[in-house]
Amino acid sequence: MGSVSREHESIPIQAAQRGAARICAAFGGQGSNNLDVLKGLLELYKRYGPDLDELLDVASNTLSQLASSPAAIDVHEPWGFDLRQWLTTPEVAPSKEILALPPRSFPLNTLLSLALYCATCRELELDPGQFRSLLHSSTGHSQGILAAVAITQAESWPTFYDACRTVLQISFWIGLEAYLFTPSSAASDAMIQDCIEHGEGLLSSMLSVSGLSRSQVERVIEHVNKGLGECNRWVHLALVNSHEKFVLAGPPQSLWAVCLHVRRIRADNDLDQSRILFRNRKPIVDILFLPISAPFHTPYLDGVQDRVIEALSSASLALHSIKIPLYHTGTGSNLQELQPHQLIPTLIRAITVDQLDWPLVCRGLNATHVLDFGPGQTCSLIQELTQGTGVSVIQLTTQSGPKPVGGHLAAVNWEAEFGLRLHANVHGAAKLHNRMTTLLGKPPVMVAGMTPTTVRWDFVAAVAQAGYHVELAGGGYHAERQFEAEIRRLATAIPADHGITCNLLYAKPTTFSWQISVIKDLVRQGVPVEGITIGAGIPSPEVVQECVQSIGLKHISFKPGSFEAIHQVIQIARTHPNFLIGLQWTAGRGGGHHSWEDFHGPILATYAQIRSCPNILLVVGSGFGGGPDTFPYLTGQWAQAFGYPCMPFDGVLLGSRMMVAREAHTSAQAKRLIIDAQGVGDADWHKSFDEPTGGVVTVNSEFGQPIHVLATRGVMLWKELDNRVFSIKDTSKRLEYLRNHRQEIVSRLNADFARPWFAVDGHGQNVELEDMTYLEVLRRLCDLTYVSHQKRWVDPSYRILLLDFVHLLRERFQCAIDNPGEYPLDIIVRVEESLKDKAYRTLYPEDVSLLMHLFSRRDIKPVPFIPRLDERFETWFKKDSLWQSEDVEAVIGQDVQRIFIIQGPMAVQYSISDDESVKDILHNICNHYVEALQADSRETSIGDVHSITQKPLSAFPGLKVTTNRVQGLYKFEKVGAVPEMDVLFEHIVGLSKSWARTCLMSKSVFRDGSRLHNPIRAALQLQRGDTIEVLLTADSEIRKIRLISPTGDGGSTSKVVLEIVSNDGQRVFATLAPNIPLSPEPSVVFCFKVDQKPNEWTLEEDASGRAERIKALYMSLWNLGFPNKASVLGLNSQFTGEELMITTDKIRDFERVLRQTSPLQLQSWNPQGCVPIDYCVVIAWSALTKPLMVSSLKCDLLDLLHSAISFHYAPSVKPLRVGDIVKTSSRILAVSVRPRGTMLTVSADIQRQGQHVVTVKSDFFLGGPVLACETPFELTEEPEMVVHVDSEVRRAILHSRKWLMREDRALDLLGRQLLFRLKSEKLFRPDGQLALLQVTGSVFSYSPDGSTTAFGRVYFESESCTGNVVMDFLHRYGAPRAQLLELQHPGWTGTSTVAVRGPRRSQSYARVSLDHNPIHVCPAFARYAGLSGPIVHGMETSAMMRRIAEWAIGDADRSRFRSWHITLQAPVHPNDPLRVELQHKAMEDGEMVLKVQAFNERTEERVAEADAHVEQETTAYVFCGQGSQRQGMGMDLYVNCPEAKALWARADKHLWEKYGFSILHIVQNNPPALTVHFGSQRGRRIRANYLRMMGQPPIDGRHPPILKGLTRNSTSYTFSYSQGLLMSTQFAQPALALMEMAQFEWLKAQGVVQKGARFAGHSLGEYAALGACASFLSFEDLISLIFYRGLKMQNALPRDANGHTDYGMLAADPSRIGKGFEEASLKCLVHIIQQETGWFVEVVNYNINSQQYVCAGHFRALWMLGKICDDLSCHPQPETVEGQELRAMVWKHVPTVEQVPREDRMERGRATIPLPGIDIPYHSTMLRGEIEPYREYLSERIKVGDVKPCELVGRWIPNVVGQPFSVDKSYVQLVHGITGSPRLHSLLQQMA
């Protein structure tokens, strides 16, 4: 229960005291609240105890006595009616189910209402008489009338208690007797359970039914009662609560029968009925039993009256004490009119027998406020029934505790708020006024977008010129250029105060998308497109948001077709509360496309929700045609016929009615057919779904939606095919039906339809395409696409179709058909002459397919015939069917009965003449409105429109106004509501015409014939802190207006940013002086002229010199300083910037500004070192912007947008650093045509000490319809392309290219790779078509290592090509040298999303970036330029994103960014919340490619997208050595990676051809033996190759063979190894090296190999590293070298019969022995083992200090080393074991180790791991004797000229020294010191 306010500030009470409010007290009755009635009393008692004590005493005593009376005691035993005890001790009260029975709930409900009334009086400190004096009337719902009658007779507190005692007695006896009179229930347990299971509640005597109309409920009752038979079982309609809420009463078992019936007729919850006609839908019904056990308001309680009166013989009510109207619940009559003896019987019957009609009661209340005292849902019912009538319903029974009488004075009265009125205009004439006239400035009648009528711009212009709102139908446009051109034509033809609204179809997503794009650009250019209407669907919230926020429209309308769609529009309006949303309702009776909905029902149900959105403009249409039929919809009176209050619409739209207007392009024959149609009324239109109704019928359109059209002969065929053919959804069954009925359908097409059957032969017989000759096809095409009697094509595209078929003939028969002509007859003659007898051949099958393809082309208007009865028959039949109504001449026989004419079944009755202009039609309607309103007595007083619409300035407390005789100041403080500019401007300029009024109140200005938004008005839009200063003449005329704004530096200073002045009242000068701290202060002057026409004054801008003045402003702002040179510089000039030094202070300032906007996690990020890559725009700013100033570039810099910018470091150069001295030059790369303007691309080159370092490219978009230069051009540096000439065909193709000029034509191309470095230059015609293409550049022979040699050049020039011939060729046969390789799983492992806000102000960035463009820092300037306010510098947004990416990758010295390219896609406004997302998306040439995006968190619009090429963290590539080989290694990559497979294949081929074995076979199978045969010629070559290999040192001057036993006479040689050949050194080494190089190739193919990275190899891995990362040896030579090395090592030592040596290798980890056991200890142990045993062993590899070493030696020594290491690991201090103790440990193991055979494999120890497959002591002194032969072998194969130091210096880390390779003397000394190489010794002597 809510407390009642004590405040006498109660608005309703005050109003009632003044007589300004009429308050009605309403009381509730029985219902679901029965179960909680005692709980309600208890809560009220807890809150108001003392105030209610006297009333509760009266009630408790009265009810207790009555309950103990003889007539009641049987019912009330054993609980009695001890109310006081129940309230003080609730647990002793009966259960809520017992209390809900009528004998108790009835008096308790009455008491609850009276108690709340009593508490209200106490809170207001009024006695009941005083309170009653403020009431206008009273009533009650059902038993609530008892409480109502009690308060009407109360004069004081005593009389109030007396009245309460009396009505409680009446209530007690009614409840008791009703309970006793209730027929006994025959409901079974099954019935009860059934209702519970169906969610209908516990079976009772009253059933709530909602969702049906009253007539539907009565039909349900009639049906059920027929089945019940006897009347004593019937169900009755007891209560009519609202239009769709009812309560039925009767025996529970009978109500169960109602439930059964309702279940059968109602719709399931998930049933979709949207495509079912409203009349045929199942209703959505809710039924619920109420906890009421007596059938109140039914004849079943007819005897209660007498019994109650008998019990009340001592009670009486004095009629004379009822001082206020008391309304009967069934009739609504005033009970004051009754005689005294009639009152009690009337009250009893009103509760027990009489049907309750609550809507009737509420309609007669005549109240402004209703106080609902409950209990129950009375309040919601009253609110529902009185909504829109101005009645405020205040509920006093809510749990939340409102101030019940503190509500507003009155609720909205829809009729008063939205109804049509007459107001006086400035001349005193009567003028229509409502929300549409206020919001759109047009009369409340409009013409809807409708194809084909409003597709025509001239028709739309005629409506606009008549002064009415109209929509251009975008559905009739299929090309962007045509759509744009027609809008521009329309813009020139409409009045200055009229905007353009385009009607778009959301059902065509592609068309919708490009039309939105066109409109967006047109708005940006100032074309007055003010709104769009979206039909055929409601877009997604994201699409709507885009339309609302980014286009610049004033309003968007939607055409919902259902309840759900209406709610979608309401949600859109709530999402965008400050944007005007139109809701156009046409429902199912409209002409053309329509829904399945009833016209009135959905609006009746949603009107209140619609009107809760003040930004919705509600327009109604369909079925209208004149004034009398539309007038009730504008006043709202139409709703009264349905029992609702007035529901006015804001406007009426006409569609079908306008098709017969004089200006409409509808053919005369079609107009006559429309006029002849009779039409029908609202009750019958739905019949058109089944049959012609009033001359109109519904068919299914090409979109599958119902559409109303005239029932012509052709349309009736359409209807028939809808039913017979198109309703068959199974394609195969439909085709079968078409085959079976082909002859009938074809005949009907030819006889009745606008699209005839195409395939007709020369004899007039219907055939198929396959049966026609080429000449017959040609003739038929001409007949059906050309209007011969008017000598024109039906559509120009059909001529293209015909010529394409002629081209097909030319290609088919290889004959010349030159200049076929313009006219069909000429074409036929020329084709026939050229083809001769071939013309009479039947079509080839492939030509039939080609012909069908031609018929289906999207760039051709859909063909006007049916080519086939195939699966596309419905498309052929229905597509593009509306145009014939405007071109009957193009129809066969000009037969209007064949065509498709849109019309509505109701609207058609109003079309009675084809000689009315649009102006006459619309004016006549509006004139009727004026006459009807003038005749209405309520509208005799005509108000002043200005006095009604204009708000006082006092409504805006934040506006401080100071005026005197010479000056007016209007200052917008930093708090308070934003002033409405129209209100403010009206106060400034007054109502009289003047130059100032024209400047401030005109919505548009004219410039060069174009209408644009008024920039002065936009600039003057006040922001917080702004002041408008108005200076007056001595005659109080305005002479000057100034806008004074804060400087934006954070201080308190302000300056004049805009000054408007006129000395003669005709010429106006507007001076913009953006508040930028430069000296001298920059400013620009705009000149205007006030054109004083009789009816209106308009503002026209003088455009002469305008562009030059703006350029001069920007020269000053950007400090370009070359105004005199700009006239002599041209588009091909080179521009230079000043030489400058990059200083620490500049970089620090730049970074400080960026840090201010950084999110919290980046505040401490402060990288040092290189210059931020985007600081390059600051360096290059002067050079980048100077090209914008050249005089030959025609542009308005106010329309300049920074579209994109990129920074690219030159290859291998070091990034810029502080201290660098740089100079920049630039040139224009492109001035290119874009659909909505011109794109200017400028490239700047930053040089450091004469070396090119960075290229900066910037795209500037220049909006507007005028081209920026006479000859647009593009200069493009094409990507480097590589073509591999890998076939004879490709060689021949290259030879044939005339544009490829070779330096040496004799040089064979086959096998070469050619690198192309080209530039393209394109010149364009003004229409954007290519006029000249020139491609030039160099061609190089390209080797895999990246080296190039000159090969030739390219020169191509053409004036007639449609694309870039050269680049197309290279893309077809080649590929870019550096390819972007997308990652399979792009993403980011760290923080990938960062939230950041745009800067609050941009002055700081403007200062550090040198970009003082005022649109970023001056709000007034930004608004003048057409923006909503300042926008953040695009480069600041870029820098913020770059900084986040820099932080994410950890680029602490800013050295890793190699390029940054950002596209700026939407403006960022100050303080916009942004979300930056980072993703690693690709690799390119070893660099990471990051995708960085920024989104506006508020709108989810992407504002910028950047690609960054970033070097990886410093990377080294390390290749492992021998010992890791295993069978099958590398084969996964071989299978899955083409590059790896190619390398394996290349090596396999080489080794097979040169050495006779397959390395793939060895790796895949690891055979124990392999025999190479030398018998064939190839075998002998292989044997010779082996013999040329040097083995041991020469004996007697001759080298022994490397393969022992091999001679010139050997016929074969067998390699064998017991563990498999892959484990033998000679094969393991090439296999391992090959696998590693293949892996590296795979990495290169993924683009992940870092350029310039360091590399090293472990032992054998060094060869793989050099092979993968350097190029001094070819791949094949390297493989041969590694194979030789393996053979050399394999045979360096003696082997036993099994091929084994006595040697091996072992890895040791000293740290596993003990913490103190380190490198020295291990070396000592190894030395002692060799010294004591004589077995060779050495530490040969030093891998990880104190953790990993490799020892080589005799297997026994290695075995012993492993065992001793195990022993030492058990010692508590192994590092202390020295000398003698170690020797003892050695000798301990000698006996055992001497017994170990060579075949035994060493086992893994605690600190040692044997290396399997290695039986050579690599890197040991034992192999020193092999050095010299190996050195000689290498010297023969490695040529000094092939070594490229750049590949090795600083990158290669050799094993021998562990330091990066160098050619410095110090490095040579280091290597010599380690190796003692004699050659290095000699080199050092030379370097001395």
Curated annotation (Swiss-Prot):
From the UniProt entry, list the residue stretches annotated as the region Malonyl/palmitoyl transferase (MT/PT) domain: 1517-1877
Residues covered by the MaoC-like domain: 1399-1500
Q: Which UniProt keywords apply?
A: Hydrolase, Lyase, Multifunctional enzyme, NAD, NADP, Oxidoreductase, Phosphoprotein, Transferase
- E.C. numbers: 2.3.1.86, 4.2.1.59, 1.3.1.9, 2.3.1.38
Where is it found, in Gene Ontology cellular component terms? fatty acid synthase complex; transferase complex
In the induction comment, the record states: Expression is regulated by the atfB, srrA, AP-1, and msnA transcription regulators. These factors bind respectively to the conserved motifs CRE1 (5'-TGACATAA-3'), SRRA (5'-T/GNT/CAAGCCNNG/AA/GC/ANT/C-3'), AP-1 (5'-TGAGTAC-3') and STRE (5'-CCCCT-3'), present in the promoter of aflB.
Q: Which GO terms describe its biological process?
A: aflatoxin biosynthetic process; fatty acid biosynthetic process
Q: In which pathway does it act?
A: Mycotoxin biosynthesis; aflatoxin biosynthesis
Q: What happens when the gene is disrupted?
A: Abolishes the production of norsolorinic acid and aflatoxin B1.
Question: Residue ranges of region Enoyl reductase (ER) domain?
Answer: 437-682
Catalyzed reactions per annotation: acetyl-CoA + n malonyl-CoA + 2n NADPH + 4n H(+) = a long-chain-acyl-CoA + n CoA + n CO2 + 2n NADP(+); holo-[ACP] + acetyl-CoA = acetyl-[ACP] + CoA; holo-[ACP] + malonyl-CoA = malonyl-[ACP] + CoA; a (3R)-hydroxyacyl-[ACP] = a (2E)-enoyl-[ACP] + H2O
Q: What does this protein do?
A: Fatty acid synthase beta subunit; part of the gene cluster that mediates the biosynthesis of aflatoxins, a group of polyketide-derived furanocoumarins, and part of the most toxic and carcinogenic compounds among the known mycotoxins. The four major aflatoxins produced by A.parasiticus are aflatoxin B1 (AFB1), aflatoxin B2 (AFB2), aflatoxin G1 (AFG1) and aflatoxin G2 (AFG2). Within the aflatoxin pathway, the fungal fatty acid synthase aflA/aflB provides the hexanoyl starter unit to the acyl-carrier protein (ACP) domain of the norsolorinic acid synthase to allow the first step of the pathway.
Its protein name is Fatty acid synthase beta subunit aflB
Q: Which organism is it from?
A: Aspergillus parasiticus (strain ATCC 56775 / NRRL 5862 / SRRC 143 / SU-1)
